[in-house]
């Protein structure tokens, strides 16, 4: 299922000390390949894949990745234990390092299929799902969730949820430190309107010291990560990592103690070029890859031109790689 297009490398040990969140339409395999050039140790997540899509759709497309993406987790959306178990087995067979259950997405579309944050109202079902997956595979099974949903947002109810899922065998919880409001707000508003409550997640870590608790929501700097790591076991960044990807270049040294020098922006792009050539040779368009790297150029002369080349000009070019090389020149020495 994987795309062995880069030389085999020793896999780094899976650590959740720092990860990039699963994000629909963003953390596809091209995005993940790019982010991996910047950080060797960051745990990467796929976009959420529903059990129905994996069991009845184009399985190879949903599971495909490049070997360099490890450590790599597949996020699943679903609520039928047997289906989740079958999908977890597919993930393990494809070589994924972890499978994660989405109990945090608030969109109406997934709620109708009993996927995402609405499952926080059904802790026994989530526990059954987790147990089914754990019984099916040897790889890690984790859960990403909110601190509550409207109508079930007390701390006692959060502890009930975590407690039941822990009893099923889950040992790692990624906590988006907001409640999800299941009616009346868009997914975007659900990332902004409910207030961040890091203190609730911190209390959860205090009351469940045996569990690995990873904090997610509103974190924008590695300095903030280091501060929160005094309380939590790991940090997960989402949109900030996507819009400001060069932040990842300092992750290995600042959070994992690596002595390897950080990659420059231009070096990251040079590493991306052969990947783009392979994608084009398979019939793919260059913008499938380059749409994910626009945030690499920020705050210096030529940044705007860089983004224009790769978001506008690339669509009109007879030779898109020439446009890529023009963009690369703008990052020379950076």
Question: What feature does the model see in each segment?
Answer:
Residues 2-334:
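Flavin-dependent oxidoreductase catalytic cores
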């Amino acid at each position: 299922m994987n795309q062995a297009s880069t030389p085999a490398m020793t896999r780094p040990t899976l650590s959740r000390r720092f990860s990039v969140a699963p994000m629909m339409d963003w953390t596809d395999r091209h995005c993940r390949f790019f982010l991996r050039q910047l950080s060797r140790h960051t745990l990467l997540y796929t976009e959420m894949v529903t059990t129905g899509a994996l069991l009845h759709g184009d399985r190879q497309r949903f599971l495909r990745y490049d070997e360099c993406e490890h450590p790599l987790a597949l996020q699943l959306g679903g609520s039928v234990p047997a289906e989740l178990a079958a999908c977890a087995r597919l993930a393990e067979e494809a070589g994924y390092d972890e499978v994660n259950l989405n109990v945090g997405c608030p969109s109406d579309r997934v709620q109708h299929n009993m996927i995402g944050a609405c499952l926080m109202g059904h802790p026994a079902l989530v526990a059954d799902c987790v147990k089914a997956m754990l019984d099916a595979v040897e790889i890690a099974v984790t859960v990403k969730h909110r601190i509550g949903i409207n109508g079930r947002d007390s701390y006692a109810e959060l502890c009930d949820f975590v407690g039941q899922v822990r009893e099923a065998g889950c040992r790692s919880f990624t906590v988006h430190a907001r409640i999800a409001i299941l009616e009346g707000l868009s997914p975007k508003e659900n990332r902004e309107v409910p207030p961040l409550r890091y203190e609730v997640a911190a209390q959860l870590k205090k009351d469940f010291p045996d569990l690995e608790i990873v904090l997610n929501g509103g974190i924008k700097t590695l300095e903030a990560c280091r501060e929160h790591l005094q309380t939590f076991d790991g940090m997960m960044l989402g949109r900030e990592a996507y819009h400001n990807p060069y932040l990842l270049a300092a992750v290995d040294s600042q959070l994992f103690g690596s002595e390897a020098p950080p990659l420059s922006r231009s070096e990251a792009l040079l590493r991306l070029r052969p990947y783009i050539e392979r994608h084009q040779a398979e019939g793919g368009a260059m913008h499938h890859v380059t749409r994910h790297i626009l945030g690499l150029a920020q705050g210096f002369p030529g940044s705007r031109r860089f983004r224009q080349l790769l978001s506008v000009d690339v669509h009109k070019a007879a030779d898109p790689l020439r446009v890529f090389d023009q963009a690369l020149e703008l990052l020379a020495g950076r």
